Amino acid sequence: MRPVAPEKDGPRVNEEIRIREVQLIDQDGQNRGVLPTRDALLLAQEAGLDLVEISPNSSPPVCKILDFGRFKYQNQKKASEARKKQKVVEVKEIKLRPGIDTHDYDVKMKAMLRFFEEGDKVKVTLRFRGREMAHQDIGYKLLQKLKEDVTNIAKVEAEPMLEGRQMIMILAPR
């Protein structure tokens, strides 16, 4: 039984290309047409470059003459740039109390606006203590006021709901 070659990630290069004919693109980007793989390899070696399989699924496979080390470096660079540009959406939490003062409310609103500008979701938690549980309507009205204040910059993802001793609402940026 013959040992199975380990699967290599990335394109096949030079002698790894075992197909009879390939569609060749030279180092200048010119289409050279369908050539035997042997001839394509010779052209690549004459240029001092590598024969790299760009599109293995087409018929015949498309190969290009280029510097493989440089090709790998550019692909890694593109991948790292794409990773940098990805933004992970976080859920930030703003904690309130039913008897919040206007200035404190304004400070919380500023923080919330900053979170929305950064593209994050906001979980607003309104905590009730002691006898405040008897006046849940005050908390509900506060969350409704907050919802109205952010309607133009955020949308409600989860309406206000009571969980134990706290009322929770989740907002997402528009």
From Swiss-Prot:
Its name, as the record gives it, is: Translation initiation factor IF-3
Major localisation:
cytoplasm
Question: Does the keyword Protein biosynthesis feature in the UniProt annotation?
Answer: yes
User: Is tRNA-binding among this UniProt entry's keywords?
Assistant: no
Q: Name one GO biological process term.
A: ribosome disassembly
- UniProt xrefs under InterPro entries: T_IF-3_C_sf, T_IF-3_N_sf, Translation_initiation_fac3_CS, Translation_initiation_fac_3, Translation_initiation_fac_3_C, Translation_initiation_fac_3_N
Q: Which family does it belong to?
A: Belongs to the IF-3 family.
Q: Name one Pfam family in it.
A: IF3_C
Record keywords, A-Z: Cytoplasm, Initiation factor, Protein biosynthesis
Q: Provide a GO CC annotation, any one.
A: cytosol
- Described function: IF-3 binds to the 30S ribosomal subunit and shifts the equilibrium between 70S ribosomes and their 50S and 30S subunits in favor of the free subunits, thus enhancing the availability of 30S subunits on which protein synthesis initiation begins.
Subcellular location(s) of the protein: Cytoplasm
**GO molecular function terms listed in the Swiss-Prot or TrEMBL record:** ribosome binding; translation initiation factor activity
Its quaternary organisation is: Monomer.
